[in-house]
């Protein structure tokens, strides 16, 4: 295989994309990245970068036709997936495939596949496209419930509603967090689960491989901490792998899929799936012999996927900072790195207006509890320059 002739175009240039591009660069692959704003994280390490509205079909198709990449790799949901379907029909290689990109761009498509076609166990749910429909479905779902925009990312617009006086506020919050013109929401029965995991699932030319389960803590619908491995009963792990394989086989294509699952005893509930590396999987930058970004790249281009190993218990902590500046300066990294078991990735985002994830702390230890505490201690040192 001559990988030096491969040309990868990444649609979206965030922090996950940056690590993916670094993995490609290390193997001598030509990289092109695209996003809606200049100097996005992945643009800082790619050979070429372009700024376009990826929801604009003409702009997206013109750029792809002009650059003629070997592989087109979506990193975000805010892409015109109808264009991807069209381009795939003209023999462009969409990762993992246009069907997966289109189905997972909104929660309605993927939930219909999981619950209705595959009969996977999920929470009780309903969709609503207006405030009145929302009020109606609440009657059947009951309190407490979770509301999420049909189209959103990074937890935007998600909330848990426990009291009647929170119902209106949650609807408004979902509308403000919705992406594009979509106003629909999914209302889900709240499952009092024991824990939630991400099961990184790798579809490749030789079959399907799994990483050890990743435990994580979410706040306001967004990842804050993750750790690997998450200890769980063999029965629940086997069921989790079965569900992950079933949903990823239905989506098809090659690459890493982040399968989110709720676990209650030996019961496993499907939550969501993303056809790309997962933010909770950033812990694999320190925990595994091959991290999730390298796995994604290998699966895409057809390189071998050997035995995936967790080298040591590890944890990650999102560096979520708050401020209002166009030139963010981060302090405390020296103190955080004083611990030999800590590493840090700063994403290279300059602007921050409100709260923004600016980096990640990585820590390793003899067990995940200590690794998590170590990551939190290092995180406490990091702040914006005043």
Curated annotation (Swiss-Prot):
Taxonomic lineage of the native organism: Bacteria, Pseudomonadati, Pseudomonadota, Gammaproteobacteria, Thiotrichales
UniProt-listed SUPFAM superfamilies: Glutathione synthetase ATP-binding domain-like (SSF56059), PreATP-grasp domain (SSF52440), Rudiment single hybrid motif (SSF51246)
Domain ATP-grasp: 112-301
Subunit structure, as described in the record: Homodimer.
Taxonomic superkingdom: Bacteria
Positions that bind ATP: 107, 148, 153-158, 188-191, 196
Any one of the GO BP annotations: 'de novo' IMP biosynthetic process
InterPro entries: ATP-grasp (IPR011761), ATP-grasp_carboxylate-amine (IPR003135), ATP_grasp_subdomain_1 (IPR013815), PreATP-grasp_dom_sf (IPR016185), PurT (IPR005862), PurT/PurK_preATP-grasp (IPR054350), PurT_C (IPR048740), Rudment_hybrid_motif (IPR011054)
Stated name of the protein: Formate-dependent phosphoribosylglycinamide formyltransferase
Family, as annotated: Belongs to the PurK/PurT family.
Keywords: ATP-binding, Ligase, Magnesium, Metal-binding, Nucleotide-binding, Purine biosynthesis
EC number per UniProt: 6.3.1.21
Keyword set includes Iron-sulfur: no
Pathway recorded for this protein: Purine metabolism; IMP biosynthesis via de novo pathway; N(2)-formyl-N(1)-(5-phospho-D-ribosyl)glycinamide from N(1)-(5-phospho-D-ribosyl)glycinamide (formate route): step 1/1
Residues reported to bind Mg(2+): 260, 272
Residues bound to N(1)-(5-phospho-beta-D-ribosyl)glycinamide: 15-16, 75, 279, 349, 356-357
PROSITE patterns the UniProt entry points to: ATP_GRASP
GO cellular component: cytosol
